[in-house]
């Protein structure tokens, strides 16, 4: 039987793809793309939030604090969370409120975990002002320099609330609050002990000494006052509130302080001012060359001729025969013939003439900084030396015209003996001085009448007592002196007994009034004389009224001597237990003591310093009290150069150095050799 071949295996047929499967794949592709895009967007949002959070933290904390956060000096200054501080202060309730500063409120924060209590200062930034934020950053930047002193309040941390723009600083808690609250408001019994007050004064001095002599760079506090002096549980004083403090730069020197000294000198600005004041040429005869060269401050201008011919010869003097020189004059001349040369106060133009000088020997001697007008169009010239060459024709013509105006018709009358010429020069000098004085007096009287009219208008409008105090500050010293001169002696004496205390405050702030008259109206309107007599800080100036030094008022440059001045006022407040300006409805005797600084100066002149001491103090050490008042008066001197340094003050208080003496102007018995020369001429 024939075999059958098996049929070959046929692979199964693949089903053809249908239209429904392709449509399903087309639907899943957009879902995958949408999911990936959503995930990418979420990741971008998270990264953006992280970057924003980092940038916000960098804006809250200063850059130098962040960059140096790894240094051991910054380990104490930590960042607190806002929620943690809010729980510790019971949501900043009134029960934990300790006080209110210039730009923030202070609360007590209790931490249950550590058991410690801290002080939390919430900076006020809701008013739209950046001052609170500036103080916040300023204190953070200075925190690294203030570590290591027991006399400075330590900054422990900071925090910020992004939503409410709350900037918070965390300090160590000072149980007895500020010196102003303990001494002037609550009048703590512990401060009635003199030893405790003296210890507080020493602690404050050591704290300022740490800022000036131990910190590198030097820190200037700028706002030393009782409200910024904090007391711990043992009444140990510490300096706080460094919101207005500044770091002294390396290139800062005392040139500004020296300029204050130079302002008191009588310096001739230019030749034009000399001509306007004198309006005369004084002729003086001299037989020798007794010309004394002194400092440039005592410069006068003279036309000088040397004696060549014999005294018996008589010859005409022409302007071309005169040599021009810058002549320096001393008040006490070297020879009797120089006695008639005008003093620097008169700044006259002297013509010292004689015969026999040729025009070729004319020389221009430049010896002063104020010789610019001699060197016009003369290519600068050689400063400080003798300059050869011809002098400009218009200069010689001017000199000749001035000499011809005053030359007598007869030469015999002009060339006379020395005594006669000196007497003639004195008479001319007096006569020529009358016109400027009369002109000045007329203008001054007009100004006085204008002021009287303004005062009458103010009285009619019924201004408040604050505006009357403001008028005391704006009172002109010259006007008051002329008005007092017109009064009889009895009325003038009664008036001085009431107004002397105002002179101290207005005198200390006179430099501020002179520098910025246009801005001072707004500045002085900010001075709030409260019922308690306290004076508040003003945002337009650095410091506090009555505590700020006169040279740094109106936005001036701060220096260590500004803190010294403020310490002097603070020392008087601590000794007397009174505010620097305390106006109350008391008898007239108390009203005269309203200005503490003027009262202290008056008592020093009368030799009654102990009357300044607080009557409620017991166990008083009189020597220490006199020492404190003397140091305070040394600190309150107008010239910053004359004030002592804080290192010297600490040595005085600790007894290392000898007790200081009162300043000369406050001494009750001035010595015989009075340095100021009387302006009255001997007859």
Swiss-Prot record:
Key word Metal-binding present: no
Extent of Basic residues compositional bias: 425-436
Cytoplasmic topological domain residue ranges: 52-683
Composition skew (Polar residues), residue ranges: 411-424
TM region positions: 31-51
Matches recorded under InterPro entries: At4g25390-like, Kinase-like_dom_sf, Prot_kinase_dom, Protein_kinase_ATP_BS, Ser/Thr_kinase_AS
Cellular localization per UniProt: Cell membrane
Catalytic activity: L-seryl-[protein] + ATP = O-phospho-L-seryl-[protein] + ADP + H(+); L-threonyl-[protein] + ATP = O-phospho-L-threonyl-[protein] + ADP + H(+)
Pfam families reported in the protein's UniProt record: Pkinase (PF00069)
Enzyme class: transferase
Residues of the active site: 223
Domain Protein kinase stretches: 92-664
Extracellular side: 1-30
Family statement drawn from the similarity comment of this UniProt entry: Belongs to the protein kinase superfamily. Ser/Thr protein kinase family.
Protein name as catalogued: Receptor-like serine/threonine-protein kinase At2g45590
